[in-house]
UniProtKB/Swiss-Prot annotation:
Name recorded for this polypeptide: Secondary metabolism regulator LAE1
Main location (coarse class): nucleus
GO MF annotations in UniProt: methyltransferase activity
UniProt keyword list: Methyltransferase, Nucleus, S-adenosyl-L-methionine, Sporulation, Transcription, Transcription regulation, Transferase, Virulence
One GO term describing the cellular component: nucleus
E.C. number(s) listed in UniProt: 2.1.1.-
Domain of life per record: Eukaryota
Length: 307
């Protein structure tokens, strides 16, 4: 029996924990649920990124000549929403999405396929030297070794013309006007989350050595774009306000998903006595427009050289 009195599930079946459904494939390695609220959160974040990037689906180049058939790989595709949009945009492309869990829709464009369950930290059998674009978004918290993952991506891109595009949110709270106190629940929450996921060998903290790691893997033409994302609608700038509206929705809807497993599995904290009050304290601060705090999106693009 599990801790909440349910039968122990089969190895690859979904199971209930703290009121949320988690997938059984590579059981326990991945900290985040696979239920309907989590699918909604992923799709909210897709819209959030679209707003933050002013509608831009990708930054790295994709061959658009009619006689070419670009190959696009989405690693950790989630609900598949980005892959679907790319397949719709590039009708002559071959698009493939990989994920640990089967939460993608059945009705998809004819030039799109999904391979699930697939753990992208396991060996790949996807065709080396054959992809034009490999896309990775919001992977912090599910990667044990960035050097190994970047090396896999490098070897699977076409020499000379293949690009990686990697998008992450640095979730460490930032504030330039001291309206976020040093002892805020938001800062404490992030500290606990960063520590717990580090102990689980899949840190949610943003990897600040990304440029060096991409260089070490062999990439060239490395470019970084940083977009500030406020926690709510506190900025005066209309675009920043719109970003904050979507980011607040994604964060507040996903607080339980981000918090429950790390703090109960790693720290063994009681869900109702300890973890839920933390979540509610963080939620209040995220929605407080008097707190002028933000995170940063980091968008990395890089090319595999010919030699």
């Amino acid at each position: 029996m599990t801790s909440n009195g349910l039968p122990v599930p089969a190895q690859n079946s979904n199971y209930m924990e703290n009121g949320r459904w988690y997938h059984g494939f590579r059981r326990g390695l991945y900290m985040y649920p696979c239920d309907e609220p989590e699918k909604d959160r992923m799709d909210i974040y897709h819209q959030f990124f679209a707003v933050a990037r002013r509608g831009q689906l990708h930054q790295a180049p994709v061959p658009s000549e009619p006689h070419l058939q670009p190959r696009i790989l989405d690693v950790g595709c989630g609900t598949g929403i980005w892959a679907i949009d790319m397949a719709d945009k590039y009708l002559n492309a071959e698009v493939l999405g990989l994920d640990l869990v089967n939460i993608q829709p059945e009705k998809i464009p004819p030039n799109l396929r999904f391979r699930v369950p697939r753990d992208y930290e396991s060996p790949w059998t996807l065709g080396e030297d054959s992809w034009d674009l490999i896309h990775l978004r919001m992977a912090c918290g599910s990667v044990e070794s960035w050097p190994e993952l970047y090396q896999k991506i490098y070897t699977h891109l076409k020499p000379g013309t293949g690009w990686i595009e990697h998008i992450e949110i640095d979730m460490e709270p930032r504030c330039d006007d001291y309206t976020l106190p040093p002892d805020s629940m938001l800062r404490k929450w992030y500290g606990w989350l960063a520590d717990a996921t580090q102990r689980a060998y899949r840190p949610i903290a943003y990897e600040h050595r990304t440029r060096q790691l991409l260089q070490a893997a062999g990439f060239i033409d490395i470019q970084e774009t940083v977009i500030r994302v406020p926690y709510n609608t506190w900025p005066n700038d209309p675009h920043q306000k719109d970003i904050g509206r979507w980011y607040n929705l994604g964060l507040t809807e996903g607080l339980e998903a981000l918090t429950f497993a790390p703090l109960t599995r790693v720290y063994h904290w009681d869900l109702n006595a300890h973890v839920r009050p933390i979540v509610e304290g963080v939620r209040r601060e995220l929605c407080n427009r008097k707190i002028h705090a933000y995170n940063n999106i980091h968008i990395w693009t890089a090319r595999r050289p010919q030699q």
